[in-house]
């Protein structure tokens, strides 16, 4: 079984995370899957952003659920971007590149989920879209229903799955879409892992990398898609364990390593 490579918030090592620019780069790097995060705006639009607030990734402050879509669309989702250094020796060069890239992607906008779906369709994406429902800190009323309605109305060229740290959100999505692929996100809490393994409707676990890399871990009854795996040694080790997928900020690098390790 070939381990799939999922682009974490797109190719966020070199583009502003969870933006169309980041997803475009993930397609260029030939990621097998793309992972993104969804929240609800004040006017119940599905917003693709990781944090509960816009503070870290934009030029404004405030909670996503306190802002309307039109307000969110005025924000700059590229202004705080910094290129991730993959090697200390390349830091100076990458800082220079980061300044150039930041200039290019300043004024990048926060997308809606609908815009991302349209973009992936227009670019003939045929992989898997991992939609993380961000209800672990704030539970948005009816987000699961709004999300499911958005997805089932479309005839997509690609597959999709839902994931969440919130067990109840995963349950609700199963009730709405009984045959959809559902993943339970976990840290290293063994009780959470067992809960995910025992629930029949959960088809996969998305554990933190330290769990899958642990010497105590040998195999799992369900597929594992492991997050967030960026170091070459960790990618290689997980490839030897034949996990279902690696979720990484560096999809092209991970694909290159996979080619070497899983011939």
Regions found by a protein language model. Name each.
Residues 1-263:
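Phosphate-group recognition and catalysis centered on beta-loop-alpha active-site segments
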């Amino acid at each position: 079984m070939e381990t799939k490579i999922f682009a974490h918030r797109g190719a966020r090592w070199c583009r502003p995370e969870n933006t169309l620019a980041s997803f475009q780069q993930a397609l260029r790097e030939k990621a097998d899957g793309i992972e993104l995060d969804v929240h609800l705006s004040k006017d119940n639009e599905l917003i693709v952003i990781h944090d509960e607030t816009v503070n870290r990734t934009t030029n404004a402050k405030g909670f996503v659920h306190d802002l309307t879509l039109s307000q969110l669309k005025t924000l700059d989702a590229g202004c705080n971007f910094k290129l991730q250094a993959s090697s200390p020796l390349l830091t100076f060069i990458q800082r220079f590149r980061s300044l150039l890239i930041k200039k290019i992607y300043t004024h990048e906008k926060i997308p809606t989920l609908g815009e991302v779906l349209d973009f992936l369709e227009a670019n003939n994406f045929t992989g898997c879209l991992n939609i993380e429902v961000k209800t672990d800190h704030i539970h948005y009323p009816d987000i699961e229903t709004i999300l499911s309605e958005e997805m089932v109305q479309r005839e997509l060229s690609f597959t999709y799955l839902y994931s969440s740290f919130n067990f109840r959100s995963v349950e609700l999505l199963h009730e709405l879409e009984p045959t959809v692929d559902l993943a339970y996100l976990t840290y290293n809490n063994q009780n959470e892992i067992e809960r995910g393994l025992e629930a029949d409707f959960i088809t996969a676990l998305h554990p933190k990398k330290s769990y899958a890399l642990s010497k105590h871990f040998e195999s799992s009854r369900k597929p594992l898609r492991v997050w967030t795996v960026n170091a070459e040694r960790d990618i290689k080790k997980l490839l030897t364990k034949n996990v279902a997928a690696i979720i990484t900020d560096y999809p092209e690098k991970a694909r290159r390593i996979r080619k070497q390790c899983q011939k």
